[in-house]
Amino acid sequence: MIAFANAFPYFEKINTSLLGLSIDSNSSHLAWMHDIYCMTGIVLPFPIIADRNGSIARKYGMISNDISNTETVRNVFIIDEKGIVRVILIYPMNIGRFIPEILRIIQALQTSDCSSYPIPAN
């Protein structure tokens, strides 16, 4: 989440909202956000949803029962303004997300939505 916070201005520049979700409690989120601030000075500039019963996480396939039925896996969902899930990225718990690739995907989707040209690699 720190990487997303650091890249927040780039997401804003491409008209993209960020939202975090976990099945931890509000108090757990507040303590975690406080720890991040105390250790790094970073304030998370986007909301974090406390999905206590896991209903949202289950609907989006974020809980891998073969790993744990109480922890979400690291997912990134790119959802367009119509509410359509356009991209799902699933990361192992021990691998961080690659923010430049996420930004590239969003920009590629935005560009391809406005033209009939495919977006090349790299």
Predicted stretch roles:
Residues 1-122:
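Chalcogenol-based redox active-site neighborhoods
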